[in-house]
Amino acid sequence: QTHRLVAHQFDQGQEMHAELLKVWENRKDEVGYLGNALYSMVTTLKAHIADLKATTAAKERIEGEMSAARAIQMGMLPHNFGEPAPGARFDLHAVLEPAKAVGGDLFDFFPLDEHRLFFLIGDVSDKGVAAALFMAVTKTLFAVEAKRDSASVGGIMERVNHSLCENNPEGMFVTVFAGILDLRTGEISFSDGGHELPFLLRHDGGAAMIEKKKGGLVLGFVAESVYRNDLIQLQPGEGLVIYTDGVTEAMNGDHELFNATRLGDSLAAISPDCSARTVIDRVMNSVRAFVGEHPQSDDITLLALRWHGPSGNGPPAAD
């Protein structure tokens, strides 16, 4: 009888339980004690398996929901860059390489009129679906406010910030760098809300972080925050590289950060004739080579922009 019990499979359920219970009731010797022990073990194991199945199903459901949230988030970002047309006055490319968790990085760009290009990059303070939703709201507000009144980048920031603060029960915030490039003059009017300062790509080669300005607070924190306008004057062939802290805080196996110095060195090694796409690709390659197999903990977002002059010298013939 004991051999028959051992031969049973755990998923035979009630039949096995009944036999174990019968052994336990009819025998008071070692076999009875064994039956009692087996009965307790099987009962515990079945409960554990049931819990495990429920946990696995819940985990798979959550992972599916997070994957869907990430897909929706990525779908909101510009993704069809194409190649700059000959004679184009500017060249722009951007990338967002997501970490496993749903994050809140964002970028956007769009023409305000025939001669002005709006662009921004941002980083929401948190992770998860809430951060993705906050990112979507932020991106939408910037598009609405910039197209409604683009006289001042600082004014756009103030209106977006006020809207974010009005309904923000989770206390989330977002760092933002936003600007308007005048394609006729190469002048960039920009405003900074607690974001990393970009690098200037010089027309004769090299790169340098732009001069430190008195930036504003992160958006979503204080409704009455004031955001100033600052100016950068580009020469033909010059541009900007804007990034989130996922770039400079990328970590290798020795727990060293990629940092702004390494980013500057990587940019300085890139030919001034390279396209915006190539600038992005080479920086990403530098980050990946530095990080190695260490897992990515944050979204990595980069935006590169070059101005080719008022008449447009077009993109480089080759990179």
Indicate where each model-derived feature is located.
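The cytosolic transmitter module of two-component sensor histidine kinases
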Residues: M16-L34, A88, A131, V153, ...
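Membrane-proximal alpha-helical signal-transduction linkers
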Residues: Q1-L20, V42
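Signal-transmission coiled-coil "S-helix"-like helices
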Residues: D29, Y39-K53, T248, S271-C274
